[in-house]
């Protein structure tokens, strides 16, 4: 489960109004992006992030998320970007068919990059300062 938070005056986390301010694209669109971001976090941390059979919470600062995803985008984009945007993220050179300009980006890579970069933009634009998710593991 995702829980977004924004910093409070006391330095703690409070539930943000992010999900209430995401029109006009609609909540389903952004929920899909957040689910993709969750997959990215699992890609990096996997079972190593959790004690076996116990609920754990992994908290990443926004800068931490940026660090992880920027590295991932660089890895997948390889030489497919020409410059970086104002957040330091690669600007991909995608043709209308959705592939990189040399045809080497497959659909998975394209979707992975698009979802993670859009999720990062979303967090940045909404001033989200941290991302939390909780995973419950059960005995088999």
UniProtKB/Swiss-Prot annotation:
Optimum temperature is about 40 degrees Celsius. One of its GO terms (molecular function) is thioglucosidase activity. Its EC number is 3.2.1.147. Transmembrane segments: none annotated. The keyword Hydrolase applies. Belongs to the glycosyl hydrolase 1 family. Degradation of glucosinolates (glucose residue linked by a thioglucoside bound to an amino acid derivative) to glucose, sulfate and any of the products: thiocyanates, isothiocyanates, nitriles, epithionitriles or oxazolidine-2-thiones. The active site is at 70 (nucleophile). SUPFAM superfamilies: (Trans)glycosidases. This is Myrosinase 2. Inhibited by ascorbate. InterPro entries: Glycoside_hydrolase_SF. It catalyses: a thioglucoside + H2O = a sugar + a thiol. Homodimer. Glycans are attached at residues 114, 127. Keywords: Glycoprotein, Glycosidase, Hydrolase. It comes from Brevicoryne brassicae.
